[in-house]
Each structure stands twice: as structure tokens, then as C-alpha cells.
Amino acid sequence: MKILYLLFAFLFLAFLSEPGNAYKRCHIKGGHCFPKGKICIPPSSDFGKMDCPWRRKCCKKGSGK
């Protein structure tokens, strides 16, 4: 049973520390995840939620106020 706990902890840490894939779909479009209330200018730079976390949306870099 201890082995299962150790295995689970190891797998959890392995996925938690995986580098470079956070919000990959948004970054491929040239954007970053911003708070949902942010206005993206021009509107074509607002990609919506995509793979951003809850209450955030993907906007093109350097857009909005």
C-alpha cells in the first residue's frame, strides 16, 4: 500500500513540474491568459477562453487596456 502512495505522489509531481506546456493553445496563437474582464483591442485579438484557467481569456500579446 505504501508503494501505491509513493507512486501516486511521484506521478503527481512529475505532471505538476512538466515544463513549457502551460496554456499551449493560447501561446501558439501569440497570446497570453488575462482576466476575463480585460478588453482585447482590436476585437480580432480576443481568442476567448481556449485553454486558459477559469475566469480568464486568451488575448494577443500587447493588446487591451
UniProtKB/Swiss-Prot annotation:
Q: Which keywords fit this entry according to its UniProt record?
A: Antimicrobial, Disulfide bond, Ion channel impairing toxin, Myotoxin, Neurotoxin, Potassium channel impairing toxin, Secreted, Signal, Toxin, Voltage-gated potassium channel impairing toxin
Q: Which cysteines are joined by disulfide bonds?
A: 26-58, 33-52, 40-59
Checking Pfam families in the record gives:
Myotoxins (PF00819)
Instruction: Pull one GO CC term from this UniProt entry.
Output: extracellular region
Tissue expression as described in the entry: Expressed by the venom gland.
Q: What is its main location?
A: secreted
The compartments listed are: Secreted
Checking InterPro entries in the record gives: Myo_ane_neurotoxin_sf, Myotoxin
| Signal keyword on record | yes
Q: Name one GO biological process term.
A: envenomation resulting in occlusion of the pore of voltage-gated potassium channel in another organism
Q: Where is the signal peptide?
A: 1-22
Q: Identify a single GO molecular function assigned to this protein.
A: potassium channel regulator activity
What family does this chain come from, according to its entry?
A: Belongs to the crotamine-myotoxin family.
What this protein is reported to do is described as: Cationic peptide that possesses multiple functions. It acts as a cell-penetrating peptide (CPP), and as a potent voltage-gated potassium channel (Kv) inhibitor. It exhibits antimicrobial activities, hind limb paralysis, and severe muscle necrosis by a non-enzymatic mechanism.
Quaternary organization:
Monomer.
Full protein name: Myotoxin-3
Source organism of this protein record = Crotalus durissus terrificus
